[in-house]
Amino acid sequence: MNTIITMLCGVAFMCIPLGCHAQADGWKLVWHDEFDTEGAPDKTVWHFEKGFVRNHEDQWYQEDNAYCHGGLLVFEGRAEKRPNPMWRKDSREWRSSRDSIRYTSSSINTRGTFQFLYGRMEVRARIPVTGGAWPAIWLLGTGVEWPSCGEIDIMEYYRIDGVPHILANAAWGNDKRYDAVWNSVRTPFSHFLDKDPLWASKFHVWRMDWDREYIRIFLDGELLNELRMADIRNGSIGNYGNPFDKPQYILLNLAMGGDNGGEIDDASLPIRYEVDYVRVYQKEGL
């Protein structure tokens, strides 16, 4: 089976020249964003999520908090208080029951502009590690509701019972709507600090290798999680198929608080999540 890349013609320039950044082991660069243009991320490539979106998170997503500067894509998590335009009196729905916005951040994705099936994805980034920070690099499928669409979390950082962790996960569906089967590896942040006490001040490379047999997630070359494709099957909602046999699109976001982020350390705000590049490679006949 040949690899699949799906792009709108308007973003084809993102892949030129393909020869740059080639890797010695036969991987060919097929898509990338180096974030070299000052200002907003390219809106022909990246779509913004807006408002309160998921996981009971505390931040309001808006466009102002993501921008390119000095060759980096910067997400800023800020303390900003203003009325919630979605507020409804007596509402029990979490998005509309909050009368105010207290924090803002950004979330962007390539849904409808770029998706890929199999390959290597690399992201070089520096993440915030303060209380309440929940940065992520992840992928989602389309065509069926979550989690049967499949989710790959190349990177998540948050605190579990107060202890900072870096996570590498995948999720798919079962027979119950909106209920996921998770394969999650949670590595205590101390594992990385023991090797480098200055880890949090530096950029690091997250990598996913994805083919017909395995999904492998790495951090600075260290294997964090390995999933066998043969072990992954949706339930009845996903027609018992493997969601990772279909293309996925890219998401980058900085969440704050919510179900997993924990208590936000207001004294540390604003916080920054910085992305140097996103690159996708493929091999012929992968």
Residue positions per predicted region:
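GH16 jelly-roll
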Residues: 23-286
